[in-house]
């Protein structure tokens, strides 16, 4: 007879019951009850359910997936979308598989930025030595020389990297909704230079040197040889069982890694300031525009706090998408809040139609609906409105007028009419 792994949860209860049935709780009875229960466990059956190794392909082809003509990730044989639960009851393994695919997606998007969008990969820090950790951003050929317009793209926090809005959208929906590529292509078509930030690439990881544990020496007691042998035998059996259950509980321990942070780019906020100082501030463009999603909005506000005068002199308009900034917590001053009210607009997740005014408790930029209640989709759904907003802001500046700003004001006027 064998019992399932789930039954092990009740092991302490069974032991207590065995003790009660035998009419005592001395050490001999406890040991006998435990041995009896353990002898019924089918270890071979448990081993069959062991977690497979975290050995995943490093290419889309290896995963047997590819992007079709619509930019959707599909299985090359079945045509089906990506399946997360590839193996039942192995959530951790499935998650690791998903993360491995995500790393491939990141490299794939990098390749598209260079091959499809004709962007250049620029290493930072600009004065980095050969041996120190480095990151990079992407820029169009005319990013620093375009005299008219420059668009700067900042994604949110998490696993996303340059060129992405949301990994989940890329894998489960399509490249258009999940990447910044539509923004980049339209911007270039409309005469913008483009800079794509990479605010989550803050460090590199290296494996910690394994420390060799010193073997413990004998305690040197004078106990009889027979008793010591019996104790050692019990100890070995106990260790063997403990090691087995530890292997089942955590079959593949993660490698211990240490993080080496990238100089002056150790956080999204640092990265935004660094790219401003070394690239955006040097750009020739008369009008600089930002598109910042989620935590990218917080990074922009932090940039403005640290470089207020410079930002005001160069930036014409800022489109935020479901930004998580907070002018109170970030201690943005009154002049910053006033500038944001005049030059920023935040497209937030909402079930209201696109561009409908959404009330805010914070005294900063106007908030309008992105036309979706899904956070990760706000950039893609507000895509046409953002370009219209920038065009209006640019036109207003060129005619020496304040931008009528905001889709919020347009909506209110429309409703009043």
Curated annotation (Swiss-Prot):
Its main location: nucleus. Residues 405-417 have a biased composition (Basic residues). Plays a role in the regulation of alternative splicing, by interacting with AGO2 and CHD7. Seems to be required for stabilizing protein-protein interactions at the chromatin-spliceosome interface. May have hydrolase activity. Belongs to the ARB2A family. It comes from Mus musculus (Mouse). Coiled coil: none annotated. InterPro entries: AB_hydrolase_fold, Arb2, Arb2_dom. Residues 208-248, 398-417 are annotated as: Disordered. The active site is at residue 294. GO terms for biological process: mRNA processing; neural crest cell development; regulation of alternative mRNA splicing, via spliceosome; RNA splicing. Keywords: Cytoplasm, Disease variant, Endoplasmic reticulum, Glycoprotein, mRNA processing, mRNA splicing, Nucleus, Signal. A motif (Prevents secretion from ER) lies at residues 414-417. The lineage of its organism: Eukaryota, Metazoa, Chordata, Craniata, Vertebrata. This is Cotranscriptional regulator ARB2A. Residues 1-18 form the signal peptide. Disruption phenotype: Homozygotes deficient mice die before postnatal day 25. Mice display retinal coloboma, cleft palate, and hypoplastic semicircular canals, retarded growth, genital anomalies and malformation of the heart and cranial nerves. Mice display a complex phenotype mimicking both the major and minor features of CHARGE syndrome (CHARGES). Residues 224-237 have a biased composition (Basic and acidic residues). One of its GO terms (cellular component) is endoplasmic reticulum. Glycans are attached at residue 26. It comes from the Eukaryota. Changing residue 294 to A: Loss of nucleophilicity of Ser-294. It is found in: Nucleus; Cytoplasm; Endoplasmic reticulum. Interacts with AGO2. Found in a complex, composed of AGO2, CHD7 and ARB2A. Changing residue 229 to Q: Fails to interact with AGO2. Decreases nuclear localization.
């Amino acid at each position: 007879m064998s019992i399932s792994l789930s039954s092990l949860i009740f092991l302490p209860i069974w032991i207590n019951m065995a003790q009660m049935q035998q009419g005592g709780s001395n050490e001999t009875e406890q040991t006998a009850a435990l041995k009896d229960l353990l002898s019924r466990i089918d270890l071979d059956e448990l081993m069959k359910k062991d977690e497979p190794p975290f050995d995943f392909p490093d290419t889309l082809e290896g995963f047997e997936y590819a992007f079709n003509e619509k930019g959707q990730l599909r299985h090359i044989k079945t045509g089906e979308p990506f399946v997360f639960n590839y193996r039942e009851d192995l959530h951790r393994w499935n998650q690791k598989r998903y993360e491995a695919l995500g790393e491939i997606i990141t490299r794939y998007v990098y390749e598209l930025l260079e091959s499809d969008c004709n962007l250049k990969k620029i290493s930072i820090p600009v004065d980095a030595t050969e041996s120190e950790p480095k990151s990079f951003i992407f820029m169009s050929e005319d990013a620093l020389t375009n005299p008219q317009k420059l668009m700067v793209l900042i994604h949110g926090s998490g696993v996303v990297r340059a060129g992405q809005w949301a990994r989940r959208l890329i894998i489960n929906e399509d490249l258009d909704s999940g990447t910044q590529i539509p923004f980049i292509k339209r911007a270039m078509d409309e005469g913008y230079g483009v800079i794509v930030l990479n605010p989550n690439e803050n460090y590199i990881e290296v494996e910690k040197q394994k420390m060799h544990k010193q073997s413990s020496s004998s305690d040197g007691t004078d106990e009889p040889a027979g008793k010591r042998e019996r104790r050692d035998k019990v100890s070995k059996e106990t260790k063997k069982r403990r090691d087995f259950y530890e292997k089942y509980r955590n079959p593949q321990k993660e490698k211990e890694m240490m993080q080496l942070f990238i100089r002056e780019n150790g956080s999204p906020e640092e990265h935004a300031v660094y790219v401003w100082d070394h690239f955006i501030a040097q750009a020739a463009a008369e009008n600089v525009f930002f598109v910042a999603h989620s935590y990218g909005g917080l990074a922009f506000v932090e940039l403005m706090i640290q470089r207020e005068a410079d930002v005001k002199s160069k930036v014409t308009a800022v489109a935020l998408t479901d930004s998580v900034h907070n002018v109170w917590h970030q201690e943005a001053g009154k002049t910053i809040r006033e500038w944001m009210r005049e030059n920023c607009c935040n497209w937030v997740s909402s079930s209201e139609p696109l561009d409908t005014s959404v009330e805010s408790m914070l005294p900063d930029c106007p908030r309008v609906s992105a036309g979706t209640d899904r956070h990760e989709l706000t950039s893609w759904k507000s895509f046409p409105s953002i370009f219209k907003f920038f065009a209006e802001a640019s036109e207003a500046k060129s005619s020496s007028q304040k931008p009528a700003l905001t889709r919020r004001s347009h909506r209110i006027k429309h409703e009043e009419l």
